[in-house]
């Protein structure tokens, strides 16, 4: 199933914050986790992820640091901040409201 580009963009921030709430991570691992969580429906690229990470970093919702990976190469690891956790909680409430509204509308539409 092809996902609507607007839906993918709208879900990017809460997805990234939720993944980082599980623990620190780096770009490629975040992309893999998105694919895993979506059952393969969301196939992100570097070009989709890094602008989101950079924006979240500018907003103070994510912090980044360089560290050596197991193979000795340096990777940039991202972690969610206290402000990011607050933003995640706010976005969760907003998405739950949208979900509830859509479910209600769709249930009525299916009975008409």
List each model region and its residues.
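Short, solvent-exposed loop/turn elements at beta->coil junctions and helix N-caps
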Residues: 4, 67-68
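N-terminal helix-turn-helix DNA-binding core of bacterial DNA-binding proteins
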Residues: 4-48
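Basic amphipathic alpha-helical segments that dock to polyanions
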Residues: 49-56
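Glycine-centered, phosphate/nucleic-acid-interacting loop/turn motifs that mediate DNA/RNA or nucleotide
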Residues: 60
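Short beta-strand "wing" residues that participate in macromolecule-binding interfaces
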Residues: 64
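Basic, amphipathic "hinge/linker" alpha-helix immediately C-terminal to the N-terminal HTH DNA-binding motif
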Residues: 70-92
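Amphipathic alpha-helical dimerization/coiled-coil segments
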Residues: 86-112
């Amino acid at each position: 199933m092809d996902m609507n580009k607007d839906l993918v963009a709208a879900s990017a921030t809460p997805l990234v914050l939720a993944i980082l709430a599980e623990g620190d991570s780096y770009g490629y691992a975040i992309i893999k986790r998105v694919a895993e969580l979506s059952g393969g429906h969301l196939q992100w690229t570097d070009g989709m992820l890094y602008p989101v990470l950079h924006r979240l970093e500018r907003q103070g919702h994510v912090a980044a640091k360089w560290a050596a990976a197991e193979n000795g190469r340096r990777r940039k690891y991202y972690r969610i901040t206290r402000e990011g956790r607050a933003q995640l909680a706010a976005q969760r409430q907003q998405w739950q409201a949208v979900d509830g509204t859509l479910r209600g509308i769709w249930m009525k539409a299916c009975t008409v």
